[in-house]
Curated annotation (Swiss-Prot):
Pathway: Amino-acid biosynthesis; L-threonine biosynthesis; L-threonine from L-aspartate: step 4/5. The gene is thrB. It comes from Yersinia pestis bv. Antiqua (strain Nepal516). This is Homoserine kinase. GO terms for molecular function: ATP binding; homoserine kinase activity. Keywords: Amino-acid biosynthesis, ATP-binding, Cytoplasm, Kinase, Nucleotide-binding, Threonine biosynthesis, Transferase.
Length: 309
């Protein structure tokens, strides 16, 4: 039996729309991500369990893990009879890379079970393709950090898809999911087709400055560069309470605050435990909208997807 855990991820990280992503894991050891296990069987089967199992499609063939198995078998040129179990711990439409977690765990579990016939670049390419079936377009800003860990800059050049960006070990990422769903397609549709030149210049400066600050280990500069002029000004209207949360983050002393992916999850970056706890407390009391919501204090997950058994 092979069991894979794939962690949650922050798409865009405010400053890198569609080209930057970061994997995160709670500091208390909670598994914030999906697990997929694979065992030998006479015929294929897929069983779903976990906290958010009720949100999965009724038709098994619409389940992205079924599609992972199907795509992997296609790549291998044969049908591989296995029993798969998806442990769905991630809310769907949350902005935490939920579909990426299932895709990464599903494909990596199949690859490990079969003795790693596919290399990482090939597997990551397939992950992006399958993620595209869910979100409507191939993009790697969730699957790359989820699979490889840490912060990943999506380059798609010279035979590789992404490269690692060094993070800051003392940063704490407070993640708050309010318990409502935002459609990725809707969140993309709300964005303008064209941008003003000044916004393009600001975006380029912020992203270049952030990547430079990460590589030269300047956390204050990196935090100042974490501004989103591409998506956040337009998506705020889809996220009740986000503007108030961003103001609270500033008042509490967070270094930065932004939308995780297309939302509704937000993240706030803090550089000490006391600030992170205050931020988490505020979000717990003011940003969550129902019992499905949660807040976690996280660090960058530098390991990425990994074997649990």
């Amino acid at each position: 039996m092979v069991k894979i855990y794939a962690p949650a991820s922050i798409g865009n990280v405010s400053v890198g729309f569609d080209v930057l992503g970061a994997a995160v894991s709670p500091i208390d050891g909670t598994l914030l991500g999906d697990c997929v296990s694979v065992t030998a069987a006479e015929r294929f089967s897929l069983h779903n369990e976990g906290r958010f199992v009720s949100k999965l499609p009724d038709d098994p063939k619409q389940n992205i893990v079924y599609q992972c198995w199907e795509r992997f078998c296609q790549e291998m040129g044969k049908e591989i009879p296995v029993a798969m179990v998806l442990e769905k711990n991630m809310p769907i439409g949350s902005g935490l890379g939920s579909s990426a977690c299932s895709v990464v765990a599903g494909l990596m579990a199949m690859n490990e079970f079969c003795g790693q016939p596919l290399d990482k670049v090939t597997l990551l390419g397939m992950m992006g393709e399958l993620e595209g079936r869910v979100s409507g377009s191939i993009h790697f800003d969730n699957v790359a950090p989820c699979y490889l860990g840490g912060m990943q800059l999506i380059l798609e050049q010279e035979g590789y898809i992404s490269q690692d960006v060094p993070g800051f070990s003392d940063w704490l990422w407070v993640m708050a999911y309010p318990g409502i769903k935002v459609s990725t397609a809707e969140a993309r549709a709300i964005l303008p087709a064209q941008y003003r030149r000044q916004d393009c210049i600001t975006h380029g400066r912020n992203l270049a400055g952030f990547i430079h600050a990460c590589h030269t280990q300047q956390p204050d500069l990196a935090a100042k560069m974490m501004k989103d002029v591409i998506a956040e000004p337009y998506r705020t209207q889809l996220l009740p309470g986000f503007a108030a949360a961003r103001q609270a983050a500033q008042d509490i002393g967070a270094l930065a605050c932004g939308i995780s992916g297309s939302g509704p999850t937000l993240f706030a970056v803090c550089n000490d435990q006391a600030t992170a706890q205050r931020m988490a407390g505020w979000l717990q009391n003011h940003y969550l909208q129902n019992d499905e919501g949660f807040v976690h204090i996280c660090r960058l997950d530098t390991a990425g997807a990994r074997l649990l058994g």
